[in-house]
């Protein structure tokens, strides 16, 4: 959404800070995902609910036909409430509590992505108590390093996620000994905010090697889940509002060798929702320091933690001013020195009351908000509802 396309008069009437979602851009993004994925037989797309669990956002995504990728019992509950069919819900996570596993069993979800033998044994025990058989896939750690921030790299041997590749056959053997789990797939996830298709190609090569090994042992799996990880252009949200899903899906179609009848599952989060969301915040004060000036706004890292947590860049725009630009540090009210959205960025001259839009905030924004300093959680509003 370009700067001039924000409904400023309507936004001025809403108490800040809040999240504003462009419903049409979200739908356009989903249409692009479906158009490109459907070119390839057996491609199945799930939305990574951890990126955004706003109820209206989830409903729009469910209406587009995507499944849900969940990493907690709460996300399973949110997905069920939003109307996702249980047959399209997958549940991953390195530390699944008993009640969360039981929730998945009670809802007959598509698959548990299992990360250890002890977890597998607990799932088997809980499934037996309910007289059910749980479908499980094993999350393998492919030791593929993604070119992204260290805090969102998940596919290296040093990370807490997944089972070592060398243990693949032994964990499959353990599953075959248990009567209330059914081994159906392999799961991978190498990281997030990946823009280099070479990283996904490297994952494909590793998956091909593992499948070849399974073939040698006459082991067949129903599906391969390669996770998500596709990034977005935070620097140019207006120029590149929709990621290159064609290049993404084509990479897997060219380089990953599926067996006959296998399905290939994806778990896209950021790429689906990041660009449709903006954090709208109001300017409280312009403070002139000895060497710089500060634009102090009413949003803080309690509302959008990515800049403080990951040193992440978000484009910021003054959507109520067309005056000449000046350099500002944009900072929030939280009692921490890390409560900074940007340093020395050029904005149209800011005044008290001006609205700023912190762009590309639809993923890992509202969902990661906290009440530190006893602050209220921000609300979310859809463009077609205000």
How would you describe each model-predicted region?
Residues 5, 262-386:
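Charged (often Lys/Glu-rich) extended helix/loop segments that serve as interaction or gating elements
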Residues 25, 52, 75, 96, ...:
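Short, glycine-/Ser/Thr-/acidic-enriched flexible segments
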Residues 1-134, 177-182, 212, 216-219, ...:
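A charged N-terminal "starter" segment
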Residues 39-41, 128-131, 216-217, 237-240, ...:
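Short, glycine- and charge-enriched coil/turn segments that flank and shape catalytic ligand pockets
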Residues 143-285, 347, 373:
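Active-site loop/helix belt of alpha/beta enzymes
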Residues 48, 135-141, 187-189, 225-227, ...:
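Short beta-strand segments
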Residues 46, 135, 223, 263, ...:
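Hydrophobic "anchor" residues on beta-strands that sit immediately upstream
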Residues 22-25, 29, 33, 53, ...:
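General structural feature for long, well-ordered alpha-helical segments within catalytic domains
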């Amino acid at each position: 959404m370009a700067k001039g396309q924000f409904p400023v008069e309507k936004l001025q009437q809403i108490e800040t800070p809040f999240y504003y979602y462009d419903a049409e851009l979200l739908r356009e993004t989903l249409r692009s995902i479906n158009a490109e994925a459907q070119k390839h037989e057996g491609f199945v797309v799930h939305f990574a609910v951890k990126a955004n669990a706003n109820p209206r956002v989830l409903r729009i995504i469910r209406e587009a036909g995507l499944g849900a990728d969940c990493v907690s019992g709460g996300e399973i509950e949110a997905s069920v409430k939003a109307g996702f069919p249980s047959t399209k819900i997958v549940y991953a996570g390195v530390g699944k509590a008993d009640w969360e596993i039981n929730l998945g069993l009670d809802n007959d979800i598509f698959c548990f992505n299992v990360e250890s033998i002890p977890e597998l044994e607990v799932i088997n025990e809980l499934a037996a108590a309910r007289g059910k058989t749980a479908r499980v896939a094993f999350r393998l750690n492919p030791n593929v390093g993604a070119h992204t921030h260290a805090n969102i790299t998940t596919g290296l041997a040093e990370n807490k996620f997944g089972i070592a590749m060398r243990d693949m056959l032994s964990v499959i053997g353990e599953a075959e000994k248990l009567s209330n789990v059914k081994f159906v797939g392999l799961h991978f996830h190498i990281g997030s905010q990946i823009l280099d298709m070479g990283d996904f190609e490297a994952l494909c090569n590793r998956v091909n090697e593992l499948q070849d090994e399974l073939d040698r042992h006459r082991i067949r799996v129903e599906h391969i889940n390669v996770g998500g990880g596709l990034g977005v252009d935070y620097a140019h949200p207006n120029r590149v509002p929709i990621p290159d899903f064609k290049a993404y899906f084509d990479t897997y179609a060219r380089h990953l060798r599926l067996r006959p009848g296998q399905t290939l599952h994806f778990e896209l989060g950021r790429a689906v929702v990041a660009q449709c969301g903006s954090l709208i915040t109001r300017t409280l004060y312009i403070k002139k320091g000895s060497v710089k000036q500060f634009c102090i706004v009413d949003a803080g890292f309690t509302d959008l933690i990515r800049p403080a947590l990951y040193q992440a860049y978000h484009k910021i725009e003054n959507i109520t001013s067309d005056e000449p630009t000046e350099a500002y540090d944009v900072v929030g009210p939280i009692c921490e020195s890390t409560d900074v959205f940007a340093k020395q960025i050029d904005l149209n001259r800011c005044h008290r009351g001006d609205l700023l839009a912190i762009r590309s905030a639809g993923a890992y924004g509202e969902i990661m908000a906290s009440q530190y300093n006893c602050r209220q959680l921000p609300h979310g509003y859809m463009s077609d509802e205000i």
